[in-house]
A protein has these predicted regions:
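Catalytic glutamate of the conserved HExxH
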Residues: 66, 70, 74
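Generic recognition of long tandem-repeat/solenoid scaffolds
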Residues: 28-34, 111-113, 277, 295-297
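Short pre-active-site segment immediately N-terminal to the catalytic Zn-binding motif
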Residues: 56-66
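Charge-rich, well-structured scaffold segments of protease-associated domains
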Residues: 1-12, 60, 74-83, 87-269, ...
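Short, conserved catalytic-motif segment at the N-terminal edge
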Residues: 49-53
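N- or domain-start disorder-to-order transition segments that initiate the globular core
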Residues: 1-48
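Short, low-order "capping/linker" segments at domain edges
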Residues: 269-286
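Low-complexity, Gly/Ser/Pro- and Lys/Arg-enriched regions
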Residues: 19-21, 286, 303
Length: 314
């Protein structure tokens, strides 16, 4: 394994913030802060031959248009250095990756990729990072219309239809009674707050989707000072850190970024008291709905200690 400096020391433009051991993973954990860009790097160092890289951005759901999910689809379409119709599928079919994806959650968006070849991982990292920095999908709306929302007319006699990869994915959950129950729960616990917004609701809020809104989300979220980079496995981490610093991170100083206090979205005051909500979930005509019922009981755990959380989980 690579010998790294001690906590508080520096290497390749990074300062080591913390070092610890996680016996469950058989790993030494090192946390770095990149001085120029403000990015955080977490290296999980063990003997696993499977090498991993993950870009994680803090992306609170500011509304229910599923714009963060749309942006995730757009980011790995094409970029200035690697132009393509869909670079994600190019990489998937032409590289030695063992896992590759883009994932959107209610609080973050991440882009993991794995390979057993360090050289391949470096190349894939370069593609991912270039796409995060200069995505072609935000320069003109071709990719937006493909992945987000567009009108289609098959024949003159037909009605206009709404299409789009993310829109259709969300539409597929229209009658998902559990997802609709989750949405009612969030809206009841966190009325008028960011936490009430869940992903996957574009089919209900498609009028709020716009190319301009997607561009604004990119400027707000996609900067290295709002990014955690995770490295995993038995790798030449000095080589990786040098590559990240030289080719990418140092090109985007934190001082040049718009300062957005994204953490404030996760610390909004919680409505106190007991609330009750009754909601209805759509069902297709002919589907029996008499026995489809869900009763949820939710508790807000904001401000709980670690001991409290363990108690509630177990």
């Amino acid at each position: 394994m690579t010998t790294l400096p001690e906590k508080g020391e520096g290497i390749f433009g990074y300062k080591i913030m913390d070092r610890t051991t996680v016996s469950m993973l058989g790993a030494q954990i090192t946390e770095f802060s990149h001085i120029c860009s403000g990015a955080r790097v977490l290296y999980i160092e063990n003997d696993d031959r499977e090498l991993g890289f993950n870009l994680i951005y803090r992306t609170p759901q500011l509304d229910q248009s599923d714009s963060n999910h749309i942006l995730e689809h757009l980011m790995l379409c094409s970029c200035s250095r690697y132009p393509s119709r869909d670079i994600f599928f190019d990489m998937d079919s032409k590289s030695y990756s063992t896992f590759m994806n883009g994932l959107t959650d209610n609080t973050y968006t991440c882009y993991p990729v794995c390979s057993q070849s360090e050289d391949q991982l470096l190349k894939l990292m370069d593609v991912f990072l270039c796409c995060m920095e200069e995505p072609d999908a935000l320069k003109e709306d071709y990719f937006f219309r493909r992945e987000a929302l567009r009108y289609e007319l098959e024949n003159e006699e037909d009605d206009l239809s709404l299409e789009g990869t993310v829109f259709n994915e969300d539409w597929g959950h229209l009658t998902d009674i559990q997802e609709n129950a989750d949405s009612f729960m969030a809206e009841t616990l966190y009325e008028s707050q960011t936490a009430s917004h869940l992903l996957g609701r574009a089919h209900f809020h498609y009028k709020d989707i716009s190319f301009k809104r997607i561009q604004e989300r990119f400027k707000k979220f996609y900067r290295y000072s709002n990014c955690l980079i995770v490295l995993y496995g038995k790798m030449d981490v000095a080589r990786i850190l040098d590559f990240l610093d030289r080719e990418h991170l140092s090109r985007f100083p934190a001082a040049d970024c718009v300062d957005n206090d994204l953490l404030s979205y996760f610390h909004e005051p919680v409505n106190r008291g007991f609330f009750r909500c009754k909601g209805e979930s759509p069902a297709y005509e002919g589907n029996p709905g008499n026995n489809n019922r869900i009763i949820d009981y939710g508790i807000d755990l904001s401000g709980c200690s670690e001991d409290d959380l363990v108690y509630w989980i177990w």
